[in-house]
Design a protein with these regions (language model features):
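Positively charged n-region of N-terminal signal peptides that target proteins for export
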Residues: 1-5
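Low-complexity, intrinsically disordered short peptide segments enriched in small/polar/basic residues
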Residues: 6-7, 29
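A beta-rich soluble binding module of mature secreted/lumenal proteins
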Residues: 19-172
């Protein structure tokens, strides 16, 4: 039940927010190969929200379900207690590009998960929402070199996100 409350409250607000998404000029990548996208991603940075407060070692794991939807397992270690937390969700692609997903931690509420930038070798990804309230930089590695991180910070700025709002994730 603690897991539900840790990740739950703000995920609900994410879903309510994205249900009323306004028109946006935010562009996603042209195409995502879901098979290559699956697996473990480590969070490098994010916009702060209560469902991830006090979290370190944040990662997301994506796997394909039998029904062709995506199983999402987000996890972290609480900094203050060193307690492991996780939250499970289901995602599906809204079109053939696979760059716009809908994710639900609490059905029937689904939130936007847009892939805004993706390395050709699937080593890093920028994920955001059309409302620009949510933003994540993820990597296949726990640590990202400064040169690449600076490149991605320039990219998020060009997309209209405020890089000063980013929280950098502790990865051990």
């Amino acid at each position: 039940m603690k897991i539900f409350s840790l990740f739950g409250v703000v995920f609900l607000s994410l879903f309510f927010t994205s249900c009323s998404t306004k028109q946006t000029d935010l562009k996603t990548v042209e195409k995502v190969d879901l098979e290559r996208y699956l697996g473990t991603w480590y969070e490098i940075a994010r916009y702060e929200h209560s469902f991830q407060k006090d979290c370190k070692n944040v990662k997301a794991n994506y796997s394909l379900r039998e029904d062709k939807k995506i199983q999402v397992v987000n996890s972290c270690t609480k900094i203050s207690t060193n307690e492991f937390k996780d939250a499970k969700a289901i995602a599906y692609s809204v079109d053939e590009t696979n760059s716009k997903l809908k994710v639900s931690f609490f059905r029937p509420f689904y939130g936007d998960y847009w892939i805004l930038d993706l390395d050709k070798d699937y080593k890093y990804v920028i994920i955001g929402t059309p409302s620009k309230e949510y933003l994540w930089i993820l990597s296949r590695e726990k640590i990202m070199n400064d040169e690449l991180l600076n490149k991605l910070l320039e990219k998020i700025t060009s997309l209209g996100f405020d890089k000063s709002k980013l929280i950098y994730t502790i990865q051990e």
